[in-house]
Amino acid sequence: MKFEAIAVENIPLIHTGDDLPSIICKNLELQDRDIVIVASTIVAKAEGKVFRLEDITPGKVALEMASRNGKDARFIQAVLSLSREVLVEKPFMLVTTLAGHTCVNAGIDESNIEDGFLLYPPENSDASASRLGQELETLSGKKLSVIVTDTNGRAFKIGQTGAAIGIYKIKPVKHWIGEKDLFGKVLEVAEEAIADELAGAANLLMGEGAGGTPVVVIRGFDYYCEEETFIKEMYRPEEMDVIKKGLRCLQKRVE
């Protein structure tokens, strides 16, 4: 088995209201069951998720946090506005967002945007992936999957990798439970993070900084599905999330 990862070249700087599906189709002829992987930054820009830092007024909680961690209270307020729980305050803010994604700074980006502005992530990345996928299918006449990605750190390793934050017509997790291993033993715990693995592969071509390519197409890896899927299928249930439990205990001890 083999598959291709194709960087879609000549994607221009994206602004509010830009037609991403048309731009993608203009620069690459899509094929049936392609997986279109798109950086959340350009999805957010097209959706107008750009805000001036000077327009944000910090509240009491943001001001208190700023006094403890030395960050700009306006930036903290922006993070809090997108968060339902703060797990770590410093040296960075680790939060669970309103959408259920656990990440640094609620996914708010200060890079790849003009000074003095903040780029918020898509409000509902599954919905963004769905809109993008449906429009791409209409334009191309092909059956397609879409993954919206962001770069995430890892809890126990240095460095960032691509991670899926929104999906369309692709199952995010492959369950191997019940299958047999090389020695005939039945697998009892085996779940493969397909969407994250594909996001990581795409991130190798996307790159970072000024040379970034925000759209990559995976071709030849057929994981298309007709049913509706959601990124929350990848989130660990609260009762199983020992890292969050540990961070909450640590917070209580600090308080």
Swiss-Prot record:
The record lists a divalent metal cation 2 as bound by T151, E208
According to its UniProt record, the EC number is 6.3.2.31, 6.3.2.34
Q: Which Pfam families match?
A: F420_ligase
Q: Which reaction does it catalyse?
A: oxidized coenzyme F420-0 + GTP + L-glutamate = oxidized coenzyme F420-1 + GDP + phosphate + H(+); oxidized coenzyme F420-1 + GTP + L-glutamate = oxidized coenzyme F420-2 + GDP + phosphate + H(+)
Give the pathway listed in the UniProt entry for this protein.
Answer: Cofactor biosynthesis; coenzyme F420 biosynthesis
The note describing how and how many cofactors are bound reads: Binds 2 divalent metal cations per subunit. The ions could be magnesium and/or manganese.
Q: Which UniProt keywords apply?
A: GTP-binding, Ligase, Magnesium, Manganese, Metal-binding, Nucleotide-binding, Potassium
Where on the tree of life does the source sit, at the highest rank? Answer: Archaea
GO BP annotations, alphabetical order: F420-0 metabolic process
Q: Which residues bind GTP?
A: 11-14, 40-41, 45, 112, 206-213
Task: Please list the residues that bind a divalent metal cation 1.
Answer: D109, D150
**Keyword Ligase included in the entry's annotation:** yes
What are the names of the required cofactors?
Mg(2+); Mn(2+); K(+)
SUPFAM superfamilies per the UniProt record, alphabetical: CofE-like
Q: Name one GO molecular function term.
A: metal ion binding
What subunit structure does UniProt give?
Answer: Homodimer.
**Function according to Swiss-Prot or TrEMBL:** Catalyzes the GTP-dependent successive addition of two or more gamma-linked L-glutamates to the L-lactyl phosphodiester of 7,8-didemethyl-8-hydroxy-5-deazariboflavin (F420-0) to form coenzyme F420-0-glutamyl-glutamate (F420-2) or polyglutamated F420 derivatives.
Family assignment from sequence similarity = Belongs to the CofE family.
Q: What is this protein called?
A: Coenzyme F420:L-glutamate ligase
Q: What is the taxonomic lineage of the source species?
A: Archaea, Methanobacteriati, Methanobacteriota, Stenosarchaea group, Methanomicrobia
Task: Tell me the name of the encoding gene.
Answer: cofE
